[in-house]
């Protein structure tokens, strides 16, 4: 099993290019199932989760060709309505094929998902939404069985905004008869990116980026050629790295309009931030100031940046309070950070972080995707050597992370048995 070894204490400087957003690419690739031709996507990151969705689409009958960051999906031959456990178990986002299959084939049999250790992440929202659009739903032997000769428009309301739920039901509603309204919809940029793609395909969707989305169903959708938006979480990870190491990093192929919650908080820590079009420069301050953070749905501070920001606060001056409101069990990384000398106390969904003079390198184990990134960041600022195991989590969501850090001056390497 691969490990990453980091020698800490180096100031990071230079330029890094941000990859395409995994969380935008996954639903957009799944939306290919709604067309009867070849879609072309550029700026697609080369990640384990992307490979998983490509394997699943191939199993369903799609033909996929890849060249660099370009992926072509020919969905004209899709005729298989079953997504089996051996494929779905690799990644929770595999549930994104459920609604496109029902919309296109009239039925779907999709294994209940796996792939992430963060809380329960229920799919109830997806199923209730499909039922509201006329689908028959049954849970049998670990599978979701959904069928509807033709989906019809319905009224859907989320008790809590669900990104994947919103995306799945958008794809169902795009080909449904009549009008569908989604209330308390997720507003994340990845949702808006999917809507942009669906509308380019010929869908009629309004309200993306707001809590109220209206979809007027159309008879069919056409193939498109589109580029995947930049990854705002990867961007945030490098911004934190600059502040953490008191470095000077220029980040290209970014989308600052997606980063307000992160940019505001980072500026409060004392980092100097310059934004010029799609380029962000972050210069770390002499002192890292402690700030409080509460994770919230977009445009609030993203839960996917909580672990990385906690590392920054672990070496800040003073006490910071980090409140996690999106997922339960998202402080799994704390025990590993404490092994490195971080002073963190957990109470329910709140972490109290007392800034320490320094962190110390130690053997640590990654528990999920963003926890993996936080441990790499901790290793960059720690005294001595940090050895991170179970880094396969990292490969699910970061493209060539250690190589990018190495080009910025970090002493970091991957060790393969």
Curated annotation (Swiss-Prot):
Q: Which organism is it from?
A: Desulfosudis oleivorans (strain DSM 6200 / JCM 39069 / Hxd3)
Binding site residues for UDP-N-acetyl-alpha-D-glucosamine: 92, 304, 326
**For this protein, what is the EC number?**
2.5.1.7
Pathway(s) per entry: Cell wall biogenesis; peptidoglycan biosynthesis
Report what the protein is called: UDP-N-acetylglucosamine 1-carboxyvinyltransferase
- Amino acids binding phosphoenolpyruvate: 22-23
Say where the protein is mainly found: cytoplasm
Q: Which compartment or compartments is the protein found in?
A: Cytoplasm
Q: Has UniProt tagged this entry with the keyword Transferase?
A: yes
> Which enzyme type, at the first EC level?
transferase
Q: Which InterPro entries match?
A: Enolpyruvate_Tfrase_dom, Enolpyruvate_Tfrase_sf, MurA_subfamily, RNA3'P_cycl/enolpyr_Trfase_a/b, UDP_GlcNAc_COvinyl_MurA
Q: What's any one GO cellular component for it?
A: cytoplasm
**Catalytic-site annotation from UniProt:** 116
Molecular-function annotations in GO: UDP-N-acetylglucosamine 1-carboxyvinyltransferase activity
Q: What is this organism's lineage?
A: Bacteria, Pseudomonadati, Thermodesulfobacteriota, Desulfobacteria, Desulfobacterales
Functionally, this protein is described as follows:
Cell wall formation. Adds enolpyruvyl to UDP-N-acetylglucosamine.
GO aspect biological process, one term:
cell wall organization
Q: Return the similarity comment.
A: Belongs to the EPSP synthase family. MurA subfamily.
Reactions accelerated catalytically: phosphoenolpyruvate + UDP-N-acetyl-alpha-D-glucosamine = UDP-N-acetyl-3-O-(1-carboxyvinyl)-alpha-D-glucosamine + phosphate
């Amino acid at each position: 099993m691969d490990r990453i070894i980091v020698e800490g204490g180096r100031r990071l400087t230079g330029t890094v290019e941000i990859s395409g957003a995994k969380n935008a690419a996954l639903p957009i690739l799944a939306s290919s199932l709604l067309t009867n031709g070849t879609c072309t996507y550029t700026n697609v990151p080369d990640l384990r989760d992307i490979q998983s969705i490509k394997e699943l689409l191939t199993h369903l009958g799609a033909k996929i060709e890849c060249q660099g960051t370009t992926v072509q999906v020919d969905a004209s031959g899709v005729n298989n309505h079953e997504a089996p456990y051996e494929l779905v178990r690799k990644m929770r986002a595999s549930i994104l094929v459920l609604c496109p299959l029902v919309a296109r084939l009239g039925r779907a049999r999709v294994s209940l998902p796996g792939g992430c250790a963060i809380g329960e992440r229920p799919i109830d929202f997806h199923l209730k939404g499909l039922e509201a659009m006329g689908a028959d739903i049954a849970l049998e032997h670990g599978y979701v069985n959904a069928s509807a000769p033709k989906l019809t428009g319905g009224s859907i309301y989320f008790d809590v905004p669900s990104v994947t739920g919103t995306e799945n039901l958008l794809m169902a509603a795009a080909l449904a008869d009549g009008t569908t309204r989604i209330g308390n919809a997720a507003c994340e940029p990845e949702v808006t990116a999917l809507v942009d793609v669906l509308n380019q395909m010929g869908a009629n969707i309004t309200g993306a980026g707001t809590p109220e989305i209206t979809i007027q169903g159309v008879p069919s959708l056409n193939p498109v050629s589109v580029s995947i938006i930049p990854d705002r979480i990867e961007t945030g990870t490098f911004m934190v790295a600059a502040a953490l190491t008191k470095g000077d990093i220029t980040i290209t192929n970014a989308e600052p309009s997606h980063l307000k919650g992160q940019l505001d908080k980072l500026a409060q820590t004392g980092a100097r931030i310059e934004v010029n079009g799609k380029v962000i420069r972050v210069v770390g301050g002499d002192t890292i100031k402690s700030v409080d953070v509460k994770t919230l749905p977009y445009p609030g501070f993203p839960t996917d940046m909580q672990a990385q920001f906690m590392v920054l606060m672990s070496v800040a001056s003073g006490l910071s309070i980090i409140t996690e409101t999106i997922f339960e069990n998202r402080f799994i990384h704390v025990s590993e950070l404490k092994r490195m000398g971080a002073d963190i106390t957990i109470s329910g969904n709140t972490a109290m972080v007392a800034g320490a003079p320094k962190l110390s390198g130690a053997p640590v184990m990654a528990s999920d995707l963003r926890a993996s990134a936080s441990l790499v960041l901790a290793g960059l600022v720690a005294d001595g050597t940090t050895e991170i195991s179970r880094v396969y989590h990292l490969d699910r969501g970061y493209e060539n992370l250690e190589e990018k850090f190495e080009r910025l001056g970090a002493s970091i390497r991957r060790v393969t048995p």
